[in-house]
Amino acid sequence: MKKIALILSLVLMLAACGAQPAETTAPAAATAPEGTCAELVEKLYENVPVELALMTETTETSLSDAEMFAYITGLQSNEGVADVAVSMPMMGSQAYHVVLVRAESGEKAAELAQYLFDNSDMARWVCVQATEKQAVVCGDLAFFVMLDPQYGVTTDQLVEGFTTVCGGAVDAVIK
C-alpha cells in the first residue's frame, strides 16, 4: 500500500512540474482615435471637466516651414511627424501650451512625447512660467501639455480628457 501511495504521489508531482505555465499576454496597445490632430484637440476640450479661463486657439501647424514648426511645437524636426496641432492662448502672456502630434508610428510617438517633456521651455512666455507639464502616448499620438494651473485647469484634467478621447486607455503618461 505504501508503494502505491509513493508511486501515486511521484506521478502527481511529475505531472504538476511538467505542466505548462499559464500564458500571459501583454496589455493591448492603446489605439489612437481617428481624425486630424486639430479635431482631436477640440474633442479634448469637450471632455475637460472645467471651462478654460483662457481664450485658446487650436491651429494645425504646417510641416513645411521648419523654423515656424520648431517655434510653435517645441520639436526641432518634423521627421516622423504626419500631423500636428497646437493650442495656446490667442493673446497675452498666459502659460498654457498644448501640442498634439500624430507620428508615423507608435515608437516615434513615444520618442516625440519624451522629447517634448524633456526639452520644452516652461518659461517661453514673457513674465509667466508654466508650473506643470505632462506628456501622453496613445498609439501613434503624442500629447504634451504645460501650463500654470491658476487659469482654472490642471495638466491632470487635460490628461484625463485626452485619455477619454483615446477611448479610456493610453500607452504611457510621462510626469
Please name every model-derived segment.
Residues 1-8:
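Positively charged n-region of N-terminal signal peptides that target proteins for export
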Residues 12-16:
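C-terminal motif of bacterial Sec signal peptides marking the signal peptidase cleavage site
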Residues 18-25:
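Bacterial lipoprotein signal-peptidase II cleavage site
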Residues 33-89, 109, 115:
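Surface-exposed, low-hydrophobicity interaction/linker segments
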Residues 90, 127-174:
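A short, solvent-exposed beta-edge/loop patch
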Residues 95-105:
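A short acidic-to-branched-hydrophobic micro-motif
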Residues 106-113, 152-156:
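Short, conserved charged micro-motifs
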Residues 113-134:
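An anionic, turn-rich surface loop/hairpin at beta-sheet edges
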